[in-house]
């Protein structure tokens, strides 16, 4: 990446660095822009003065021009400072930070130019960050996050009605973390990636603005990240249009620039992911499934970084990734548009060569102007509504482009190449025993494997390795997982990753599932990779009662609609901004990629088993992307996990988003592709409920809303049965099988009489009949109501599965 571009991005990312320093009350004088400049001089440039000795000086003779460009981005991102600087001839002609800031600020706030400026109505420096879900959907709430940093050892930060002040001590701890990376500031792609990681870890719950008269729900990290993305796009756009005097183009003529289509909202989507993951049939399916899922996640991340690198951007320009899908903000230049086209063509050539038509990538792009993103001063309600509709329409247009490409996937050259192959589009004569391809098979043993499945088998044990949390993307490696554009993925230790950075063939490195705050370690990735046992058969042995696997498929209901219209319902759409949709996407990804591991490792709910809540779940995450989850494990743990994940998600989103799921039970030798299909059918049944927000358990017949399953089926009816038969399970089993037989014939008129007769016969004449009478009365009450009868039938099945000792088919 161009060094001056890197400087521009760093300047944009750090333009508000003075805010946490100011709120920490460390003794620096002046407004946050002056404090930020002084702080950077002390930490980065090793200025020996005490904080109180700094003044608002900008003409430092001992600081080089290159360093001053970064410092000036911090000093001159507000209009009043810009105007004074321009009048005094101090403003750099090639600094885009000020216009990028204005656009970013215009997307998420803002009545005041600065939260320590004269326009601020109520400056509340101790305010916490409020949840974006307060303004999502209908119904306004006032929940706030706890003032803390991201920590992979802690549960996700759930917003609460209790306000916890963000005091100066908490800010001081954040500033100390920031110092660790700012002290070694360098102009490199790797440093940019690490800086973004540290800013996310430290500033995700720090409010960008503390003006209490505005909605304080955009984090400082999301504001800085968006400013960095906009600044990079502007730099490229003005370079491409031959405008070297940025001051003239962006400051003197800023209203003209706001209407220029300088940006390109771009998306891509990888099709065929589910079939690729589940189309296997071999021993060791658990390891292979996880390896294939992880491989596709890394394929998506590699595609993202490759496209960004070709355009000349950092991950600040990534708005969302998950489930093989991504949104990026690019400059609207001929070079960027051609890069997207070439990227799509080369990626599909590689996918065709390696996977035939199983995987396909489609891209889409729409140009937009700053005014498509910004709230303008004195914007009327109708203007806000029209702007919000234009913004959501961009995503609809992108979706239409993707759909059109999926209907006409390949170019003429690609079709000719496909037609030159065998009838199934593949080459070769031996079939891989795992994925059934015939175009890469190289082994000749009893279970022949293609080269990819051999590599995945070798990688499967490394995916969960604590000592190999680092991933390298390299050129020309002979071992590892193949990726498009001549790259290879390998796993390594921290020490090996450090050495690899010095090698020219290393493109980039990733750190998996760890907040390495303050360390320059490359791109941080969150992956749902929890695993308790390496083989499915081990889960069957650990299940209580019947020896069965539980399989869960779950996803967010109406996520596409939520993404494009979720912030449209309040304030005439004025909250439907790119800063909020980007933060919304990031927090969902964090929930399903990071927090899901925590929920499995440290459960709280045991409504069926009643086991020790602290016992980690017996389960494996096969896949957990942007909003889609596939988990296999002991059947009882899987059901309880599904309930708990939904509970945590409900708390996190304030009930504004819902999930639906299918949960099936299978023998451990059942083909995984069939499991996936059958549980997918159950998930569809859950989504067919009015309002969705449900779960289908074992069979489409047993489809319930989540609250109904937990409160009515499990806590009421299952618990009633289990408590009564506690200590006398053998007598209970025969009784329950007869109840199920009668419930199955409930619509027959004679069955009601048979039901009463059977309950009467079951009374123990020699014992205390009062408990039985109470038990039977509840059963009879439930039998008469069709909804209660369905819930009772499900509860009886759960009790049988929980107490059955011998497996029978």
UniProtKB/Swiss-Prot annotation:
Keyword line: Antiviral defense, ATP-binding, Endonuclease, Exonuclease, Hydrolase, Nuclease, Nucleotide-binding, RNA-binding, Transferase
PROSITE patterns: GGDEF (PS50887), HD (PS51831)
The GGDEF domain, residue ranges: 547-700
Single GO MF descriptor: transferase activity
Domain of life of the native organism: Bacteria
A GO CC annotation given for this chain: plasma membrane
Location of the HD domain: 1-98
GO biological process: defense response to virus
Amino-acid biosynthesis as UniProt keyword: no
Disruption phenotype annotation: Deletion of the entire CRISPR-Cas locus (cas6 to cas2, Rv2824c to Rv2816c) decreases resistance to plasmids encoding spacer elements about 6-fold.
InterPro entries: Cas10-Cmr2_palm2, Cas10/Csm1, Cas10/Csm1_subtype-III-A, Cmr2-like_C, Csm1_B, GGDEF_dom, HD_domain, Rev_trsase/Diguanyl_cyclase
Signal sequence coordinates: none
Swiss-Prot/TrEMBL domain comment: The N-terminal HD domain has ssDNase activity. The C-terminal GGDEF domain has the cOA synthesis activity.
Assembly: Part of the Csm effector complex, that includes Cas10, Csm2, Csm3, Csm4, Csm5 and mature crRNA.
Extra facts: Encoded in a type III-A CRISPR locus.
Full protein name: CRISPR system single-strand-specific deoxyribonuclease Cas10/Csm1 (subtype III-A)
Gene name per UniProt: cas10
């Amino acid at each position: 990446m161009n060094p001056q571009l890197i400087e521009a991005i760093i300047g944009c990312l750090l333009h508000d660095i003075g805010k946490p320093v100011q709120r920490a009350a460390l003794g620096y004088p002046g407004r946050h822009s002056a404090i930020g400049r002084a702080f950077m001089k002390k930490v980065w440039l090793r200025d020996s003065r005490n904080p109180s000795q700094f003044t608002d000086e900008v003409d430092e003779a001992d600081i080089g021009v290159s360093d001053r460009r970064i410092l000036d981005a911090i000093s001159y991102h507000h209009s009043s400072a810009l105007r004074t600087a321009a009048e005094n001839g101090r403003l750099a002609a090639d600094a885009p930070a000020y216009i990028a800031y204005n656009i970013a600020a215009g997307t998420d706030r803002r009545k005041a130019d600065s939260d320590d400026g004269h326009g601020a109505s109520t400056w509340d420096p101790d305010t916490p960050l409020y949840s974006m879900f307060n303004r999502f959907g209908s119904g306004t709430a006032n929940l706030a996050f706890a003032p803390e940093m991201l920590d992979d050892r802690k549960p996700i930060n759930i917003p609460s009605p209790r306000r916890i002040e963000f005091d100066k001590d908490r800010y001081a701890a954040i500033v100390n973390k920031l110092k660790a990376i700012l002290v070694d500031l360098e102009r490199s792609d790797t440093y940019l990636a690490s800086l973004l990681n540290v800013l996310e870890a430290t500033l995700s719950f720090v409010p960008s603005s503390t003006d209490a008269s505005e909605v304080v729900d955009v984090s400082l990290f999301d504001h800085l990240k968006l400013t960095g993305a906009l600044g990079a796009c502007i730099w490229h756009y003005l370079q491409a249009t031959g405008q070297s005097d940025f001051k003239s183009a962006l400051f003197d003529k800023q209203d003209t620039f706001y209407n220029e289509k300088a940006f390109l909202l771009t998306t891509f989507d990888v099709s065929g992911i589910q079939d690729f993951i589940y189309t296997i049939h071999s021993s060791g399916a658990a390891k292979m499934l996880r390896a294939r899922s992880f491989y596709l996640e890394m394929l998506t991340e590699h595609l993202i970084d490759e496209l960004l690198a070709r355009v000349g951007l950092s991950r600040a320009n990534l708005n969302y990734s998950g489930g093989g899908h991504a949104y990026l903000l690019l400059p609207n230049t001929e070079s960027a548009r051609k890069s997207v086209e070439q990227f799509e063509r080369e990626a599909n050539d590689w996918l065709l060569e390696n996977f035939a038509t199983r995987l396909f990538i489609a891209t889409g792009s729409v140009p937009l102007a700053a005014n498509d993103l910004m709230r303008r001063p004195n914007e009327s309600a109708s203007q806000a509504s029209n702007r919000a509709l234009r913004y959501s329409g961009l995503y609809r247009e992108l979706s239409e482009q993707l759909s059109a490409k999926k209907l006409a996937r390949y170019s003429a050259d690609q079709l000719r190449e496909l037609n030159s192959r065998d009838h199934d589009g593949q080459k070769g004569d031996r079939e891989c025993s795992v994925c059934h391809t015939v175009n890469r098979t190289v082994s000749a043993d009893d279970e022949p494997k293609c080269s990819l499945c051999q590599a995945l088998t070798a990688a499967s044990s490394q995916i969960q390795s604590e000592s190999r949390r680092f991933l390298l993307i390299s050129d020309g490696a002979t071992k590892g997982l193949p990726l498009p554009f001549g790259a290879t993925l390998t796993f390594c230790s921290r020490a090996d990753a450090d050495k690899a950075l010095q090698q020219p063939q290393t493109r980039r490195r990733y750190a998996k599932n760890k907040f390495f705050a303050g360390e320059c370690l490359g791109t941080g990735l969150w992956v749902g990779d929890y695993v308790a046992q390496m083989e499915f058969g081990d889960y069957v042995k650990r299940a209580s009662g019947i020896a069965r696997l539980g399989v869960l498929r779950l996803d967010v209901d109406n996520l596409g609609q939520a993404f494009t219209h979720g912030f449209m319902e309040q304030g005439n759409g004025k909250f439907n901004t790119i800063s909020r949709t980007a933060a919304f996407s990031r927090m969902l990804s964090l929930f399903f990629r990071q927090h899901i591991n925590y929920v499995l490792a440290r459960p709280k709910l045991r409504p069926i088993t009643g086991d020790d809540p602290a016992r980690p779940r017996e389960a494996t995450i096969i896949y957990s992307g942007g909003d889609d989850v596939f988990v296999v494990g002991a059947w009882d743990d899987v059901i309880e996990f599904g309930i708990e994940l939904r509970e945590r998600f409900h708390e996190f989103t304030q009930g504004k988003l819902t999930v639906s799921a299918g949960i099936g039970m299978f023998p451990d030798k059942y083909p995984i592709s069939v499991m996936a299909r059958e549980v997918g059918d159950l998930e569809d049944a859950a989504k067919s409920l009015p309002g969705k927000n449900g779960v289908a358990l074992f069979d489409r017949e047993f489809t319930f809303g989540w609250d109904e399953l937990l409160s009515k089926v499990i806590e009421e009816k299952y618990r009633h049965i289990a408590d009564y038969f506690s200590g006398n399970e053998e007598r209970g089993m025969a009784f329950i099988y007869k109840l199920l037989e009668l419930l199955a014939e409930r619509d027959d008129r004679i069955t009601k009489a048979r039901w009463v007769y059977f309950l009467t016969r079951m009374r123990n004449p020699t014992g205390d009949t009062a408990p039985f009478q109470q038990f039977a009365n509840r059963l009879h009450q439930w039998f008469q109501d069709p909804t209660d009868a369905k819930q009772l039938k499900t509860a009886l099945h759960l009790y049988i599965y929980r107490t059955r000792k011998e497996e029978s088919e």
